[in-house]
């Protein structure tokens, strides 16, 4: 398995019910956060990569929508994921 798949499977098992549960909102938010953090490090080296920056903005927007959905559905799960990932509210 590649390093990326190992990281992804660890995130899924940490935030999901089992290793196959990738559809849960918390898992999707955690996976997006991991990719966003990776791209932020990428931009420190490649400042003029505007195509990837557009993808980053799309990921941030999708994560915000998932967080808003989770906040409306279950506030305790929302607070838990915010604290675990150390995100701002």
Curated annotation (Swiss-Prot):
GO cellular component, one term: cytosolic small ribosomal subunit
An example Gene Ontology biological process: translation
SUPFAM superfamilies found in the cross-reference section: S15/NS1 RNA-binding domain
Keyword rRNA-binding assigned: yes
PROSITE patterns named in the record: RIBOSOMAL_S15
Pfam families according to UniProt: Ribosomal_S15 (PF00312)
Gene Ontology terms, MF aspect: rRNA binding; structural constituent of ribosome
HAMAP family: Ribosomal_uS15_B
Assembly with partners or alone: Part of the 30S ribosomal subunit. Forms a bridge to the 50S subunit in the 70S ribosome, contacting the 23S rRNA.
Membership in a protein family: Belongs to the universal ribosomal protein uS15 family.
Purpose of the protein: One of the primary rRNA binding proteins, it binds directly to 16S rRNA where it helps nucleate assembly of the platform of the 30S subunit by binding and bridging several RNA helices of the 16S rRNA. Forms an intersubunit bridge (bridge B4) with the 23S rRNA of the 50S subunit in the ribosome.
The name this protein goes by in its record: Small ribosomal subunit protein uS15
């Amino acid at each position: 398995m590649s390093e990326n798949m190992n990281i992804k499977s660890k995130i899924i098992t940490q935030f999901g019910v089992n290793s196959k549960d990738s559809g849960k909102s918390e898992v999707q938010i955690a996976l997006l956060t991991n990719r966003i953090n990776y791209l932020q490090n990428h931009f420190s080296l490649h400042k003029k990569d505007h195509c990837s920056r557009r993808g980053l903005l799309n990921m941030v927007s999708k994560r915000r929508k998932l967080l808003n959905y989770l906040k409306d559905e279950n506030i305790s799960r929302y607070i838990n994921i915010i604290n675990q990932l150390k995100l701002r509210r």
